[in-house]
Amino acid sequence: MKNEFTYRGFVSELDHAIRTICRHVGRRYNVFALNRSAARLNEVRSTIHAFLDAARGAETIFPGYLRMAVLDSFFMASDLDDWHSHLQKLTAALTGAAPFSGPRVLLIGSPVYYPNFKIPMLLRRAGVEICGSIDSRTGQYEDVFAHKPEKGMEALAHYYFEHDSSSAFVWNEELMAAIRHYVAETKPDGIIWHVLKGQIEYDFELNRCEAYFEEKDLPVIRLETDYQYQDIEQLRIRIEAFGELMSQKRKERSHA
């Protein structure tokens, strides 16, 4: 649960991590260098927002699983300037493409990392598109130092603690805030709650969220998977049935 005690613990752990990294690389921590890096990352994140806007309107030629793979590569880029340049070109190429007309879902829960794209690929084959995803990385595409940049590391710790929507926290208000924001912004036809086997903490908020989804008349399906491929046929059947349900609800809304 998020409170002053857990926040101070997080700050202490981050401080220890910074000291360890500084010893390892042989460089001292500098608040001005941190702020310069944050400003650089904020420029990249602005492009990420533009990319997301363009990609969500170009799903006929650039499926959701490719959008997710591009976002994953942000954390793996060895040359951020080169990565940023490629993303700007991709964003420009996607602008103006035809939007996707089929049912669209919001993917929530256990993070889906490349190459474990079993569910995103099955969704695409079933004619269902991913309009957005919410997991422990969601808040990391926002500006790092939106407030009090002069405080350096403390501002960094405060930002990530306050914006952490992962299931590590019970009664996570940030998760609910992210869900409300994405539902309003992406207007999904349904919700897929993804849980990797063993990660039961991702179920902690499901009951609470289901009440909100019911209020918004959004059907929900919980999919539990692992890294094996033996369950693909079962997942395919359930996903196709869920896609038909969303399509039927769409028709009912259009005739209402």
Where are each of the predicted segments found?
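A polyampholytic, Gly/Pro-enriched intrinsically disordered region
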Residues: F10-I21, K151-E162, I239-R253
